[in-house]
Each structure stands twice: as C-alpha cells, then as structure tokens.
Amino acid sequence: VNGPGGGAMLTQVGHDGPKSFQFKATKPGVYVYHCASPHIPTHIANGMYGLIVVEPEEGMKPVDKEFYVMQGEFYTKGKIGEKGHQEFSLEKLLDESPTYFAFNGRTNALTGTRAVKAKVGDRVRMYIGVGSHIPSNFHIIGEVIDELYIDGSLSSPPIKDVQTTLIPAGGAIMVEFEVDVPGSYLLVDHSLTRAIDKGAVAELVVEGPENPAVFRGL
C-alpha cells in the first residue's frame, strides 16, 4: 500500500463502527501485510500477518499448481513439546528466541494428510513469505528451484537454479520448479533445528511414474 503507515491509521477501528479504505495496487509482486496496532511485535508474533500477490497487468504464465506458505514463530512460556495451553512469553519475544517455528500458523503444517500434492511433470509455483520476526533459509530437500523471484519482485528477471534462499522478516519470494521424480519432498527452514525440532516443515507429495533417467538406485 502506497500511503502513510500502509493504511494503518485508516483501519484502526474503535467502538464507533467499521472503517474501510481504498488503495490502488500499482506494483506487481508478492507482499507481506501485518497488524499495526500496539503492541505490534506481539500481534505479529501471534499470527496477525499474511500475503498479498499483485499480478502484472498481463497476468501470470500458467502453471499446474500454486501454493502459499507463510513462516512465523511462536513464543511460549512453556518448553518445546510441553502439553496444554501455552501462554505467550514477551521475554522470549524480546530476546528473539522463539519456542516454535510454523508454516501457515502451525508446527508441522502441510504434512501427512495436510501435505500439498503434485504430479510428475507438474510446474509448481510457490509464494513464500515470512510474516513474523526471524528470517528464513528456505530450501526444498531433493529439489532445485528453477526460477527464484527474489524479494517477491515480479518485475525483475528471476535467478535460475537455486538451492537455498534467504527470506527476510517481513519479506517474500516466488519460486517455480518442475517436479521430475515421484516421492516426498520436504520444505524447510534450513537452519534445521527450526525444521526438525521446532516445526518449520512442510511436505510436497509427488505422484506419478518413476523416472530412472533422472533418479534411480544402483
């Protein structure tokens, strides 16, 4: 949003009723939005963020699958794995020491029965953002990113053939790749304790025929 505070003051709603505002999306790209009410860091740490994709006027080239993934964190008074209701820890937030990392608002999201799916030969497009406070080292285990639109810019040419990329806090990217081999592929923050121990992991399940020309055991 091009305007003071990104429209924050125009959307502060009190007891006198709803508010609305209008803006023109003039720049194509992948953008993060978040809460702007005090205490802003606390609200963001509790999931008040999301992604907006502004397509170019001519539209986007077609792909077979599109997915949106947002990384964030949770700061709890309890330790990792502690059961029951977990109260928010302002101390951990100020120390920038999250208890958990999450995709789409929960740990181990998009895994198992919630995994995202594609077929061999599909062209996959992913919009990935970091809504909260800690940058992400985004990586797909077993896949190379064919095209990376760094910082979510859709008006700049993509970077080709990328293994891992950094997404800043409050930033986003778009990636495209073709899946050649069936199986399960993990989407992770490659600071791997965040994925393996703290929850920043998702699963892309690819179905279809084997492709021994690309991948096979000996």
Q: Where would I find each of the regions flagged by the language model?
A:
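Copper-binding active sites and cupredoxin-like electron-transfer domains
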Residues: 1-218
